[in-house]
């Protein structure tokens, strides 16, 4: 597991890619909306960062969420 924080540019790039894959805006991926497509795109972003070895805490800090929110999303 990587202890460092994901860079803002990496998070932004992955958010753009997740948004394109789910046909939403990057701001929706980084936002708080609970529409199914927003949630799926957000989960895809978090999963990609987790697959690269970032901890749920570091992902949460990078996207402005609580680490348990990220952990719960990655369980499903």
Predicted segments with their positions:
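Residues within well-ordered alpha helices
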Residues: 17-18, 48
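Short, amphipathic alpha-helical "recognition" segments used to contact nucleic acids or chromatin
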Residues: 37-54
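Short, Lys/Arg-enriched N-terminal segment that forms or immediately precedes the first helix
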Residues: 20-35
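The DNA-contacting recognition helix of HTH DNA-binding domains
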Residues: 66-67
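DNA major-groove recognition helix of helix-turn-helix
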Residues: 50, 63, 74
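Short alpha-helical "recognition helix" segments of helix-turn-helix
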Residues: 57-62
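General nucleic-acid-binding
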Residues: 1-17
